[in-house]
A protein has these predicted regions:
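Short His-centered aromatic/hydrophobic patch
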Residues: 87-95, 112
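A short, active-site helix/loop in glycosyltransferases that binds the activated sugar's phosphate group
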Residues: 137-175
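A short helix/loop element that forms part of the nucleotide-sugar donor recognition site in Leloir-type
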Residues: 175-189
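Aromatic "clamp/platform" in nucleotide-sugar-dependent glycosyltransferases that forms part
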Residues: 257, 276
Length: 371
């Protein structure tokens, strides 16, 4: 049985955690186990679940203290003598790959799961690190073509040296369930409302404040509409202030950070993701699997949509009113005939059970190449 050093950085609620955990839950753990390296300021480490599945959690200093972070990582790696390191930290992979090289780990996988945007404060650092992010890695992965090309370059991608493993979900857990939809809507008092939803970190990247602008325009056209927001982040207070400013507090359900996500996909009538950038977002696949019309910004790769009849891509240059009109049109078209899209999502290659077997095979082939 092979233990893989999985470098998570900050393990917060959201796409990266969901992606890696779905692969871990479904991979054959008699052949491969994951040791998770997480920054100590992570707020959503499922330690109990990981340990029940046979994995281990190592907490290291936050990457803001990069020398201490690398020193602690190095001590653990030397002790455990890994043969595979798999890092999910984008351009920050440079540092973990260097540690892996120092420790003599022969297989060092750098994975890209996101991109960048000029409006994001972190973009300057990402652009500085990007030319060096291939250093010390032996293998390259991405969860979509767009983020693979963004981090590793067209040449490496076109040469077939970047392996794409898609964002994956548990299609059964996230499938459409009308009974669950009705009970959730009853519980939250939204049985007779059009419900627009968003699940994610409340950050500049996710364009949280624009979501509020869109809903403010929408609720003027559809006064009974509700906005359901799940997540937390540095823009929480700014979001709540804007809701108050618009006078729409009674139309917004803000539930903070939650783990019981499937019931809320079922309760919604449309999902909003007007992000400044994404790799291949988990929430998009989950929402479409549950039969939700999905509104992406055009800054998000079109490969993020598994269902042509549900995925809509709109420019961020469009006004909130234009977004609102398109959303209401899609919702009214979909509501009478809503159905799950599990088979389409599976066929598009987003099912965790199938893709985890491919990841296992990839690891096994890399190990075999050492002999």
């Amino acid at each position: 049985m092979e233990r893989v050093a999985v470098i998570m950085g900050k393990m917060h609620s959201g796409g990266k955690k969901n992606l890696v955990m779905e692969y871990y839950r479904n991979i054959d753990k008699s052949k491969v186990q994951f040791d998770f390296f997480c920054d100590t300021d992570s707020n959503a480490i499922p330690q109990e679940e990981i340990e029940k599945l046979g994995g281990r959690v190592y907490r290291v200093a936050p990457y803001q203290n990069i020398l201490k972070n690398m020193s602690q990582m190095k001590a653990i790696c030397k002790k455990n003598k890994y043969r595979i390191m798999h890092s999910y930290n984008g351009t920050m992979n440079l540092f973990s790959m260097f540690v892996g090289w120092q420790c003599g780990i022969p297989i060092r996988i750098s994975e890209s799961i996101s991109m960048a945007h000029s409006a994001d404060k972190k973009t300057i650092l990402k652009n500085i690190l990007k030319p060096f992010s291939k250093m010390f890695a032996t293998n390259f992965m991405a969860n979509g073509e767009a983020c693979g090309r963004w981090q590793f370059g067209d040449k490496l991608f076109d040469e077939g040296k970047v392996r794409v493993f898609k964002t994956v979900i548990n299609t059964e857990v996230n499938k459409y369930d009308e009974t669950l939809r009705n009970s959730t809507r009853k519980e939250f008092g939204i049985e007779d409302n059009i419900v627009i939803g968003h699940i994610g970190r409340l950050t500049e990247q996710k364009n949280t404040l624009f979501i509020i602008d869109i809903f403010n325009a929408l609720v003027k056209k559809e006064p009974k509409a509700k906005l359901l927001v799940i997540g937390d982040g540095n823009l929480r207070e700014a979001m709540l202030a804007r809701i108050d400013e618009y006078g729409i507090k009674n139309s917004v359900l803000y539930l903070g950070r939650r783990e019981d996500i499937p019931q809320f996909y079922n309760a919604m009538d449309c999902f909003l993701l007007p992000s400044l950038y994404e790799g291949l977002p988990v929430v998009g696949v989950e929402a479409e699997n549950c039969g939700l019309p999905m509104f992406f910004s055009t800054e998000i790769p079109e490969e993020s949509s598994a269902c042509d009849d549900l995925g809509v891509f709109m420019s961020l240059e469009k006004t909130p009113e234009e977004w609102a009109d398109a959303i209401l049109q899609a919702v009214k078209k979909n509501m009478p005939v809503r159905k799950g899209k599990t088979e389409e999502v599976k066929a598009a290659g987003f099912d965790s059970g199938v893709e985890a077997n491919k990841l296992l095979e990839y690891y096994e082939n890399l190990i075999a190449s050492l002999n």
